[in-house]
Amino acid sequence: LAKSIQASKSSDSTASGTHETSQAQTQVLQWEGVLDEKTKRRLVLGEPVNPSPAKQTIGNYVAIDCEMVGVGPRGTGNALARVSIVNWHGHVVLDTFVKPKERVTDYRTWVSGVRPGDLKKAPSFATVQARVADIIKGRVLVGHAIQNDLRALLLSHPRPKIRDTAGFKPLQELSGNKSPGLRTLSKLVLGIEIQKHKQEHSSVEDAQATMAVFRTQKRAWDELLGIAKKEPVSNTGTAITTTSSAATTGSTKKGQLKRRVSLPSMQARPKAAAAWWEEEVQDYNAQAT
């Protein structure tokens, strides 16, 4: 199904990517064989047809992405309009529109995907802010240029609990850019395309892609941070119920999954996400039978 190549990089690290020089291996997925794009994206991003209760728990790692609209006379000001959070497996924890306090002068639909009707009955900023704060509290927060999201939410998060894929040195070196875009990393690391040209962005897809990139890098990231003991990616608890005023990922119709896929060898899979890959492939094959 997929294999990974490792690029050894000398890099600096902090909680979100910087301080102590060390050797890191950047994991890059390389796809082999014939696999339709839809199935490949589902396996990479994490969109199980019938997710198990374990995959629906919030767990210790969550990824966030926000969409903004324009406010002010020329629409140059930014206001939060949508927030999406996914867990380690890519399962949607929260996906909601947000009603801005200021009058929206530019919905930026071409990139945000937000329309006037989406915000009419959306919850208030304060309501969403409190919900997000509750979800991320005590958890490792993954994001891409995550300070933009935290700034939009008027929230802070402990630096040791932040993983910013835009600031991770091995990924910067892989892309040849100090500020690599999520679209670029998804193509380079995951082998899939998001934020396609002239298509609206989806904060759910962006959050899933960010988590997918992080999954492939987690082991190297932990080594750079000097985390000796592996943190569990999930915890015990009841399955969450996603409450959303936004359209999230669609379900796959029964009978669509026909081709079985084989599990890559341990050497071929990203070590940081080996268990995750095994579960996803098993779920895929179960649906195919």
Residue ranges and their predicted role:
Residues 64, 122, 143-146:
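Short His-Asn-centered micro-motif
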Residues 76-80, 87-112, 133-264, 269-271, ...:
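Metal-dependent phosphoesterase core characteristic of DEDDh/y 3'-5' exonuclease domains
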Residues 57, 62-64, 79:
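Short, basic and Ser/Thr-rich N-terminal targeting/leader segments
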Residues 112-122:
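Metal-dependent phosphoesterase signature
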Residues 61-74:
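Short acidic, Gly/Ser-rich segments with clustered Asp/Glu that frequently serve as metal-coordination loops
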Residues 1-59, 232-289:
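N-terminal accessory regions of nucleic-acid-interacting proteins
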Residues 44-52, 120-132:
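A short, well-structured juxtamembrane/interface segment
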